[in-house]
Amino acid sequence: MLAKHHSPQRTLRRVFSTRSRGVVAMEFAILAIPFCVLFLGTMEVGYDFFVQIALTNAVNQAARSVQVGATQFAGSGTAEAAWVSSAVCPALGRLLDCGQLYVSVTDIPSGTGQNYYTYLSANPPSLTAMVSSSNSAATCGAAAMMLLRAFYLSPTFLGMLVPIWSQASPVKPGIRVHVTYASAGFVNEYFTGGAAC
């Protein structure tokens, strides 16, 4: 009489179909990776919204101080850096690092039909240009059109896994960051003092 021969696939299938021990642990292990990525992605989106709101609030407060003439720069980098650390950084809040903030205040040249929108089209926001001349400021006199721009480099949780969510840091090579941008265009109020544009 010939021995009954079972194929290896049939034997493995029978073993796996009868033994269900560890199946739940295996299912959790399979679902853990997408759950962790989804959880970290949700946390990152929430953090990015928080940074955007904090940066927009800080830019609006700083723009108001320039608009009413409360901020007068002496034209030196020290005065501009002191203004950023005394006026813009406290408005960011304590959870954000002021060392990752880059601010620029420029006047929009009047005349030749130029306004806020044509100036932005001709001078798009550039983080690399702002990093090279960080915290530059120009305070013009009354009724001058001004533009305040700010970039904040925030850390990213999933930047290494999903490169589309982040970009290479222009300050620290090899580190991926999420760049948040806020700007405010305004016309200075009529105040005394201030440099002529």
Q: Predicted segments — roles?
A:
Residues M1-A91:
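Alpha-helical assembly-interface signal, strongest on the long, hydrophobic N-terminal helix that forms
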Residues L2-H6, Q61-C197:
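Short, conserved structural patches
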